[in-house]
């Protein structure tokens, strides 16, 4: 069921499949390779003189464990006994918040899969890296607290700042979505359009896995016509 979206390799395959059919609508994620299946094509990306940076992730990892950046194909593991890997082109020029990389954690409630019924919580989290960002070079690829935003290990940085004021969620290395959107709006950014584009990506991601969800659901509940006997909360 939800392993179609919760496992990185399955999610990658589903999104890549949709990109082949609808290239314009599914261009919102970086170039992706599932290893070892796409190993030959991925290896070819290292040809040429340009120093391309890639990020490698275990398909079943969490909290940033096992993630690394590389510019050298020789650093890519060849033993896949522990599971497949997902490789993506690293975005070297991200939008920064106070000079730090950040990501969003949004919460989505799925209450039906045939048809899809989706709700997005209006509040979310913004997680910041704990080292100021500079573009990747061969010398800084191992600086995980600069390149990655995972809370699990950034919280171990002595420079990590907790937000201790419940009345103000605009400081620290973990902030509220509302506070950051207000900041971006004050800076002149169109946050309404931003959220519409984020909602669009969430819907398209779930559309990509809807056939699988529907099949599993009806296999378990063949007589249910209400489309309401199961739910799932997803973190995007």
Model-flagged regions — what are they?
Residues 1-53, 60-62, 72-78:
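Conserved N-proximal alpha/beta basic substrate-recognition cap immediately N-terminal to
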Residues 41, 45, 49-236:
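Catalytic core of tubulin tyrosine ligase-like
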């Amino acid at each position: 069921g939800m392993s179609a979206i919760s496992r990185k390799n399955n999610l990658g395959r589903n999104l890549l499949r949709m990109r082949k059919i609808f290239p314009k609508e599914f261009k919102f994620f970086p170039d992706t390779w599932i290893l070892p299946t796409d190993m030959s094509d991925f290896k070819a990306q290292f040809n040429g003189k340009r120093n391309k940076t890639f990020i490698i992730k275990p398909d079943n990892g969490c909290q940033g464990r096992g993630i690394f950046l590389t510019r050298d194909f020789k650093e890519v593991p060849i033993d896949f006994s522990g599971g497949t890997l997902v490789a993506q082109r690293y975005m070297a020029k991200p939008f920064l918040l106070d000079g730090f990389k950040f990501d969003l954690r949004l919460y989505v409630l799925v209450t039906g899969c045939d048809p899809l019924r989706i709700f997005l919580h209006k509040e979310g989290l913004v997680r910041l890296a704990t080292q100021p960002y500079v573009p990747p070079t061969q010398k800084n690829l191992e600086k995980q607290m600069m390149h990655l935003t995972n809370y699990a290990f950034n919280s171990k940085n002595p420079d990590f700042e907790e937000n201790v004021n419940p009345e103000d969620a605009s400081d620290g290395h973990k902030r509220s979505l509302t506070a950051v959107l207000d900041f971006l709006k004050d800076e002149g950014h169109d946050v309404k359009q931003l959220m519409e584009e984020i909602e669009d990506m969430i819907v398209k991601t779930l559309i990509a896995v809807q056939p699988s969800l529907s099949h599993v659901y009806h296999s378990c509940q063949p007589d249910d016509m209400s489309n309401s006997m199961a739910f799932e909360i997803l973190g995007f």
